[in-house]
Amino acid sequence: ELLRALNPDAKFAAGETIRVADVGVGELPDVAKIEVDKSEVAVKAFDASGKLLAFYPATIGSDTLPTPNRALISEGAAPNTNYTYDPKKLNSGKADRLLTIQPGPNNPVGAVWIDLTKDTYGIHGTPAPHLIGKRSSSGCVRLTNWDARELADAVKPGVPVVFVS
């Protein structure tokens, strides 16, 4: 899927030159748009000219707690943040009261939180990278911690986040 996204016109025939991901790029240039592709269960980052900068496998919302269907805007990123569970806003846990989980290995939002304009929704890391690629979040978009950090470092407030099917 990644190779097809990088080479939409390729036939993948013997001897054909194609683009491949350079996973050792280090820092991303500034991201101008984020696309959450629900059908590919992935996050794509683009520069201002529309060039694909990064492709990250992701976890998205489940059927009962879906990921949004509309465009949102990034409001900023918070590394190593607290996670606050509010049963009035998120009815997916067993707790019946407000809980705060400090930063660390068991924090549900992992190493970084990219805040979005819809209350309680964001793009974030995870303490369980083996679950990436599943449809099991509470509506947010999960990435591995290393991917979430890389993306957060390149995203400024005001970047559009578009959800596509």
Residue ranges and their predicted role:
Residues 1-13, 51-54, 146, 154-157:
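LysM (lysin motif) carbohydrate-binding repeats in extracellular/periplasmic proteins that recognize
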Residues 28-126, 153, 157:
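Gly/Pro-biased beta-strand-loop elements
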Residues 4-33:
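Extracellular LysM carbohydrate-binding repeats and other cell-envelope/extracellular binding modules
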Residues 126-135:
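Immediate flanking context of iron-sulfur cluster ligation sites
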Residues 158, 162-165:
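Well-ordered alpha/beta subsegment
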Residues 67-68, 134-136:
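Short glycine/proline-enriched turns and hinge-like loops at secondary-structure junctions
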Residues 137-152:
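Short beta-strand-centered segments at strand-helix junctions
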